[in-house]
Regions:
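N-terminal secretory targeting modules
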Residues: 1-79, 89, 127-132, 181, ...
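Alpha-helical cap/lid subdomain in secreted, periplasmic
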Residues: 32-33, 115-243
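Residues at the starts of beta-strands that form the adenosine-phosphate
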Residues: 38, 95, 184
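A mature extracytoplasmic/lumenal domain signature
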Residues: 43-45, 100, 191
């Protein structure tokens, strides 16, 4: 049954993708007062914190001090230290939900050749609430797992395409445009990723008319942003949103 639903959704996305790909994004978020603007965080481990994820079954990477899940060597122990919490607080936004999942990929190809479909961004994209703004830092694990780039493909996707980064990323953009036509979407590009993934992301975001914020100078501990790193991400995101 799930497979039939998947293909039905693909048909809908494929039908609308070509017509809407380069259409100007409706910027409803720009007219909503900041104190009532609803933000959804749609990310991977960089955007997690235990107890703040929806669904609650999503895996977290960041935990409070003293929790057995806390990773020694990374100094982030409070949700207030995360980049997304700082953005929401400083901008006066409201958190719609944080649907982030540690280790998640855009495509289905996971670490050690595992099937990451359950945690994939393409699987989770249908459950982002009713946001005015979506902030998504999303391709880090695709770059790290060894996932194949594949070809640029902007319509007529099939399930096999989801195992390749470029078509999977294109389908994600189409799904965001279709499901959240009135939301502003900002993709956030991590540092230290493979150049070919960064360039592919630039090309695909440009095709769909989605802005891409490229981070720089992000301090990391155990491969993840430290307190200083999260602060730097927050500052760069806030600077972009204020433009």
């Amino acid at each position: 049954m799930k497979k039939h639903v998947f293909f039905l959704l693909l048909l809908v996305f494929s039908f609308s993708a070509s017509a809407s790909a380069k259409a100007p994004q409706k910027a409803a978020a720009e007219t909503v007062p900041a104190d009532s603007l609803r933000v959804t965080i749609f990310g991977d481990s960089y955007s997690t914190f235990y107890g703040w994820l929806s669904p609650a079954t999503n895996e977290s990477w960041y935990f409070p001090a003293g929790h057995p899940g806390h990773v020694e060597g990374n100094d982030v122990t409070r949700v207030e230290e995360t980049w997304w919490y700082q953005v929401i607080q400083q901008m006066g936004y409201k958190l719609e939900m944080n649907n982030s999942y540690s280790g998640s990929t855009v495509g289905y190809y996971g670490y050690q050749n595992q099937n990451y479909q359950p945690r994939s961004f393409n699987t989770r994209v249908a459950n982002l609430g009713e946001p005015d703004l979506i902030l998504s830092c999303c391709i880090t694990n695709d770059s790290w797992t060894g996932e194949t780039l594949g070809e640029y493909k902007y319509a007529n996707w099939d399930e096999n395409d989801m195992w390749y980064f470029r078509p999977a990323m294109a389908r994600l953009c189409a799904a965001l445009r279709l499901n959240y036509p009135n939301a502003r979407v900002l993709f956030i590009l991590n540092t230290d990723l493979k150049p070919e993934f960064c360039e592919s992301m630039r090309i695909i975001c440009k095709h769909y008319g989605f802005p891409l914020l490229e981070l720089h100078d992000i301090d990391k501990q155990v491969g993840h942003p430290s307190i200083a790193g999260h602060r730097a991400i927050a500052e760069q995101v806030i600077d972009y949103l204020k433009k």
